[in-house]
Amino acid sequence: MRHRYSGRKLGRTSSHRDAMFRNMVTSLFEHERIVTTKEKAKELRPIAEKMITLGKRGDLHARRQALSYVRCAGVVHKLFGEIAEQFADRKGGYTRIIQTGVRRGDNASMAIIELVGYDETVAAATTEA
């Protein structure tokens, strides 16, 4: 019986899963929005929320914990600066998952996972400038 086994294997080894989620959480904080499969987005959400909570704590130990997981020091700086300020008054629910349909090649359910304050017009203006 499979009772009380949480988490999905996603057809990968445990080390591959860990590496994939580290890359995905780094990309999420860097771009504030990523497109992935619905299952990966659902597994990524609690990891991202814990990282944002570390950013809101803001002490040295929390920064080192985030650096041990997130792959880029610049992204950690953004997490502890911009993103932590953005969610300072929010208790949780920092990310949003939007289902977008299916992928053409293999019919996989696709979703967008984004930070709650994400605004497309602001993101487009920052990439153009």
Swiss-Prot record:
Listed GO CC annotations: cytosolic large ribosomal subunit
Keywords: Ribonucleoprotein, Ribosomal protein
Keyword Transferase: no
Coiled coil: none
Keyword Lipoprotein: no
PANTHER family named in the record: LARGE RIBOSOMAL SUBUNIT PROTEIN BL17M, RIBOSOMAL PROTEIN L17
Similarity-based family: Belongs to the bacterial ribosomal protein bL17 family.
The name this protein goes by in its record: Large ribosomal subunit protein bL17
Organism expressing this protein natively: Desulfotalea psychrophila (strain LSv54 / DSM 12343)
Gene: rplQ
